[in-house]
């Protein structure tokens, strides 16, 4: 198998890169879709194999520089769409046949360590927490919702057992 260890030197690399590459077998060539591009770890590893083509999506505008760099390196073999993966059907042509589709769900270190993004609990700052194309920040939600709504958000969307105490403390501030 090809050595893909250089893709682990990225500012953020996918934790399961080896396993995904082994599973999707890009050494055979093919068409791939990366629905959560991020810094391009999976996409670039796949494109390092000849006869591969990748269409990538990411809703996060902060990844555009990574996508531009990948486009420079792989040209027509790479296509990027700044879209949510829920819009995949609008982005992919009906006759496109993917050999493998990747979804690496969750937050990335790119988002956590950029303090302006408001995902970290380790620093004071605006609570933004937008993954990408949203117009409403977490700060907006906190400032506009009532105590009951905030408790429900924490309980049902955050699976937080202590939602009442947390919501009360947020409202106090």
Tell where the protein language model's regions lie, with residue ranges.
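S-adenosyl-L-methionine-dependent methyltransferase catalytic core, i.e., the SAM/SAH-binding region
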Residues: 1-173
